[in-house]
């Protein structure tokens, strides 16, 4: 009997599943295929032994990287050693990736199997995984997979500012396309403007200069001595400017209308702008090549080096190529044609555009191309894998190529490669130290600026926080100053006031309108407007010793006076009662008279 266990890697953790014991694994194939889509049947065949969840997304990313690289992570090792049986010979572990299976078999000693029934079982586990693990939903599993996928891709697609070879690939491709377009458009301008001024084609050879002159001259009959200075500025040659002026006076070209001249000038301006953009793009390419591949640029030139990188796909791919591949890079058609026809294979590809092969004699072109390809391969590897790329090695390699050329021509023996590389190493260390010193200086300046900025922000925030409570205190003090002390109403017993309480000012009674009186509750209004009873006046001869009592008495007098002057508002029921009593009195008087 064989104990079959299956390892399933998920974004949320590792799952170890066990299958029912069978004599042969192949007997499980039809049962598994039938039960993959049915959860109930699948549970009868497969059961979950253990589930090891990842503690965080960072741990999940580490485990995913380990599985992709074929390395047994500590979490996976702990799971397998804990939950697999101790008798390793009877255990068969099914895995989805052969690399991780080989690593488990080598490190832990378990027999691993991939493919066949294992693939079908993993398909079913992947389909029903959220049902096998308690507490895991399909939505949470999908979110975990999405997050891990983004993190894994982010680590794979690394962005390094110093090795932006993709920008070089796009720049050289655009530069080649611009060269073709400018050449085509310039020929169109020459043909179009040649009907009006055919002599200008023979005088001016440069396409960009010809387009500028066509835009400036326009109608040749309007060209005179006043424009000679501007012609000299455009052509940068006084003799050519004088020849253009003389040719315009005796030209054999046809007359042209104003609308045709407008179209020619417009098209010429477009060609001029394209040529200017081409120059700026070339400057940009040179700066990028000096940052990314300085040694290759110093050896073979920026344009040829960029074409090699573009053809290889990246600087890393170019560094991985052998020198024989670099030699014929760009001549694949000729190579396969030669292999098909059993003819001579090409000696050089893109490196033919370098100056070295053109300077070599015909019999030495193959030798120098092979030597140059060897040095290009070395330079690309130095640029790709050095921490601080410098142009020192490229310059030394260029000197070696020059010495080899002179050796082919004159027989002068070049220096040994060992001596040249020792010298280059010393200079490269000095250059790297200088570059690191500059970088550290820039970093210190940046940190100093950042520190100043943070200090300014902290100072501003502290000022704001200190000014805020002061403003709050001011705003809280202002209403206290404005607020007047209102006298409190004291309950009266038998119409007598408490003599211990004094009022600084009498409380003004609120005047009510008729509508408010009608809408308010009569009982409340009656209760609120209670008339104080009159007090017995003190004898004239009596003096008051206590000042507080005297103040209280004066206050109570004012209050009684105020209550007499103010009309007492009564409710509608009291008013109705008074009117009815008056009517009764009148009726009683009339009955007595009768």
Swiss-Prot record:
InterPro entries: Nop56/Nop58 (IPR045056), NOP58/56_N (IPR012974), Nop_C (IPR042239), Nop_dom (IPR002687), Nop_dom_sf (IPR036070), NOSIC (IPR012976). The modification Omega-N-methylarginine is found at residue 359. It is found in: Nucleus, Nucleolus; Cytoplasm; Nucleus, Nucleoplasm. There is a cross-link at residues 87, 230, 240, 540, 564 (Glycyl lysine isopeptide (Lys-Gly) (interchain with G-Cter in SUMO2)). Residues 457-469 have a biased composition (Low complexity). The modification Phosphoserine is found at residues 314, 466-467, 511, 519-520, 537, 563, 569-570, 579, 581. Its main location: nucleus. Residues 457-594 are annotated as: Disordered. The modification Phosphothreonine is found at residue 468. Residues 580-594 have a biased composition (Basic residues). The modification N6-acetyllysine is found at residue 561. Residues 292-410 form the Nop domain. GO terms for biological process: ribosomal small subunit biogenesis. GO terms for molecular function: snoRNA binding. Disulfide bonds: none annotated. Keywords: Acetylation, Cytoplasm, Isopeptide bond, Methylation, Nucleus, Phosphoprotein, Ribonucleoprotein, Ribosome biogenesis, Ubl conjugation. Pfam families: Nop, NOP5NT. Involved in the early to middle stages of 60S ribosomal subunit biogenesis. Required for the biogenesis of box C/D snoRNAs such U3, U8 and U14 snoRNAs. Part of the small subunit (SSU) processome, first precursor of the small eukaryotic ribosomal subunit. During the assembly of the SSU processome in the nucleolus, many ribosome biogenesis factors, an RNA chaperone and ribosomal proteins associate with the nascent pre-rRNA and work in concert to generate RNA folding, modifications, rearrangements and cleavage as well as targeted degradation of pre-ribosomal RNA by the RNA exosome. Part of a large pre-ribosomal ribonucleoprotein (RNP) complex, that consists of at least 62 ribosomal proteins, 45 nonribosomal proteins and both pre-rRNA and mature rRNA species. Within this complex directly interacts with TCOF1 in an RNA-independent manner. Core component of box C/D small nucleolar ribonucleoprotein (snoRNP) particles; the core proteins SNU13, NOP56, NOP58 and FBL or FBLL1 assemble stepwise onto the snoRNA. Interacts with NOP1 and NOP58. Interacts with NUFIP1, RUVBL1 and RUVBL2; RUVBL1:RUVBL2 seem to bridge the association of NOP56 with NUFIP1. Belongs to the NOP5/NOP56 family. This is Nucleolar protein 56. It comes from Pongo abelii. The gene is NOP56.
